[in-house]
């Protein structure tokens, strides 16, 4: 592997200080060198075990420490999960992500998790999980089951992290990413904008991600979804341009990674989302629920794709199976579908 120079904090700070339009121009140039600028990878996320999490992440409604009105649910049955995966595939998703509100998986649950991964793979979808910290053996078992991606976010900079979470150390998160990588699973890791962090903290987060031995293949950038009952419910709103700037810097620093618009997208208007795509975002979560917070309605996403001339990406594992790609393309082009957008009619 060719030597990859490490980023410094001062270099990242310079990117954040660039005039926004110059930054967007640079990010779009980088993006076009490595990706088709009209393609967006589409994922669906399902909460397979909701609530009653023992951790104290101040942004999260799934923590048992906060009264958010969220009802705790046990681990879903394997067939329930696979039925959701079938629906996701029919709706056009190419990756199915399964999330559980745990500090770490219990050994007794591993056989069920392995069956979920195998079942999702059998459907021709990429499989992703986010289950908390993992042991080496758990990471290897998931890899053997066929897991493509494992999500484990760093959330924020090492310096600000202690203000948000105390029940899991930053090093534990880095250790889990290393175990996942060593097991041969691709890494999905990003963070949250709007926790009360400074621009320097945003730079610090991206610095950590970009300077990993191998940068994450997927980098979700979340906008804080403020949930009543959590300690961050009254945080200030994130300025749209600040969020777009973070997307652009992530694209420049990690040119071959997928940069995903994740939680908080329902708070963005179409113009903000369009600028995020211009800044280099090329992945979204598609569906009605993003774990326990709202996600834009599917049809609205397809309409936005149509307006911007974007296409849902077809994943390599689906060679010879074009069902969902054809469904999306047909919906975008057919006048009598809800997804159809006709600019001439406006």
UniProtKB/Swiss-Prot annotation:
Write out the residues that bind [2Fe-2S] cluster: 97, 128, 188, 260
User: What HAMAP family is this protein classified in?
Assistant: BioB (MF_01694)
Citing just one GO molecular function, the answer is: iron ion binding
Do you know which Gene3D superfamilies this protein is assigned to?
A: Aldolase class I
Pfam families from the entry? BATS, Radical_SAM
Identify the residues that the record assigns to the Radical SAM core domain, covering every copy: 38-256
Q: Which family does it belong to?
A: Belongs to the radical SAM superfamily. Biotin synthase family.
Q: What is this protein called?
A: Biotin synthase
Enzyme's top EC category: transferase
Q: Cite the cofactor comment.
A: Binds 1 [4Fe-4S] cluster. The cluster is coordinated with 3 cysteines and an exchangeable S-adenosyl-L-methionine. Binds 1 [2Fe-2S] cluster. The cluster is coordinated with 3 cysteines and 1 arginine.
The UniProt annotation places [4Fe-4S] cluster binding at 53, 57, 60
Question: Quaternary structure?
Answer: Homodimer.
């Amino acid at each position: 592997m060719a030597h990859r120079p490490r980023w410094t904090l001062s270099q990242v700070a310079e990117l954040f200080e660039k005039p926004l339009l110059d930054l967007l121009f640079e990010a779009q140039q980088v993006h076009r060198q490595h990706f088709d600028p009209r393609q967006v990878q589409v994922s669906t996320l399902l909460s397979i075990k909701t609530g009653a999490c023992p951790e104290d992440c101040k942004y999260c409604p799934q923590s048992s420490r906060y009264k958010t009105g969220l009802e705790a649910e046990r681990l879903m049955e394997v067939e329930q999960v696979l039925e959701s995966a079938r629906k996701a595939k029919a709706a056009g998703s190419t990756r199915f992500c399964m999330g559980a509100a745990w500090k770490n998986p219990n050994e007794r649950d591993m056989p069920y998790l392995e069956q979920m991964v195998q079942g999702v793979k059998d459907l021709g979808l990429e499989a992703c999980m986010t289950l908390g910290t993992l042991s080496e053996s758990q990471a290897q078992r998931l890899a053997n089951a066929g897991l493509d991606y494992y999500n484990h976010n760093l959330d924020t900079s090492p310096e600000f992290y202690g203000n948000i979470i105390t029940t899991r150390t930053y090093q534990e998160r880095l250790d889990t990413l290393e175990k996942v990588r060593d097991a041969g699973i691709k890494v999905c890791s990003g963070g949250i904008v709007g926790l009360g962090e400074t621009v320097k903290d945003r730079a610090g987060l991206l610095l950590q991600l970009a300077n990993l031995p191998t940068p994450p293949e997927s980098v979700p950038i979340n906008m804080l979804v403020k949930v009543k009952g959590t300690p961050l419910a009254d945080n200030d709103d994130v300025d749209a341009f600040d969020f777009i700037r973070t997307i652009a810097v992530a694209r420049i620093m990690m040119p071959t990674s997928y940069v995903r618009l994740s939680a908080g997208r329902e708070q963005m208007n179409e113009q903000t989302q369009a600028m995020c795509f211009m800044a280099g975002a090329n992945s979204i979560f598609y569906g009605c629920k993003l774990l326990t917070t709202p996600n834009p309605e599917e049809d609205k996403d397809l309409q936005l794709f149509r307006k911007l001339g974007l296409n849902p990406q077809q994943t390599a594992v689906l060679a010879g199976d074009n069902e969902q790609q054809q469904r999306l393309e047909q919906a975008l082009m057919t006048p009598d579908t809800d997804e159809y957008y006709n600019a001439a009619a406006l």
